[in-house]
Structures are given as structure tokens and as C-alpha cells.
Amino acid sequence: MEPFIHLHVHTQYSLLDGQASIDALIDKASKDGMRAIAVTDHGVMFGIKEFFNKVNKKNSKPQGVIKDSEKALKPLLAKSDPTAEEQQQITELQEKIAEAKAAIFKPILGCECYCARHSRHSKLATQDDRSGWHLIVLAKNKNGYKNLIKMVSLSWTEGFYGRPRIDKELLEKYHEDLIVCSACLGGEIPQLILQGKQDKAEESVLWFKQLFGDDYYLEMQRHETHDPNADCTIYPHQVEVNKVLVELAHKH
């Protein structure tokens, strides 16, 4: 199996949506061989500090191994003509470092934002205006993290109407060092596809592509279930949307 990590994940901080604790998510991802996971709670970043701290604690052991091994390796590499025994030590230390680096787990900080259909300042008496399109936003680095928390803060102080909403004006202003994914069936592009508005969906793809370039991704989901208690209407819609997403991805 190709290396894989989850970039759209809700924790217990996504009220009435997520259920998994951050500890459980980190443990499950690690046991499944994943070297990273994103946390993208709905409209909030309440769990990010806990997530970051717990991953740092998990990484402390392999980081200690790397530090000690590199310290022991340095004088050996400085020798112009190491003995056979020293060469064996070098090889063993390098393997130890590589193994420890492979055990490092990466926390990806993000949020599933609600993006206003019009403006974050718009407060029309419609259900559409009270929610907003779903949009996955991930921080590439510290600057991206700062831009993300700025947008999320403004979604509460300026854009709250039913839900905390960002808008495309904020995306244009704070887009640097962010990765954006088109999200689930609640995203703008999937919704336009389901409404039969493929031209509008393509216009939206081009808007995001122009702003984020190679840091913009079309997200595909395929959640088939035969559980009689589950919502079995989701999967057929995902299949319908995925077909068009593949076409748009190949085209753009």
C-alpha cells in the first residue's frame, strides 16, 4: 500500500460530529503505519494545542535517540581512516538514526472552515447563509498556522451567523502557506456538481487554483456502508461527485 495519511479528521472538539479523542486518533494512526495525521475540526481549533503537545510527547523518545546517536556518530565520521570496528559502529548508528526518524510522527494543524456563500458580513434570513460551504484548510508551516488562526478568529468575531464563517475575501488576504482541499459533499464544488451546475463548479476550481496553485486539492470521499442505521444516501452522491472531480482534476 502506498503511504497514506488522513487530512480530514474530526475529534471530540467537533461538537455533535466528532467522537474520537486525540489520544485515540494518534494511537490508531500510528498502529496503522501512518507517520502523520491532520486535525480539522468544524469551525474551531480548540484541540490543536492538545494535539501538538501530545505528538511532541510521543516524539520525545525517537528524538532523544537521534540526538544521542548523532552525538556518538560525529567523532567517528571525523576520522579519515576508521577501523573495521569503527565502520561497523558508524553503520549501526546510521541505521539507528534512520529507524528513529521513521518513528517521528507529524502533527498537521488545520480546520474544516465554513466559507460564507456570499460574505462573512452577510446575514440573510436563509439557511444557506447560516451555514456556508465546507472547506479544509491546513497549515504548511508556522506562518500558515498564523494565517489560519487569524481567519478562524475572524470567522467568530466577524462572520458568525449560525456558524463561524470565513469568506473568499479572507482567503485572498491570508492564503499564504496554506493548503486547501475542496472538502466533503458539503463543499462548494461538490454541492454545485450535485445541483447540475458543472460550469459553476469548474469556475470555483479555477478560482481556488489561481489563488493556491499546487496547494489546492480536490477531495474525494467514498464511504460505502451497509449498516441499516447509517445514512445510505451519502455514498451514491459521493460516487456521482467523484466522477466529475476526476474529470476536473485531469483538466486542470
Q: Which functions belong to the PLM regions below?
A:
Residues 1-252:
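Phosphodiester-processing cores and adjacent nucleic acid-binding clamps
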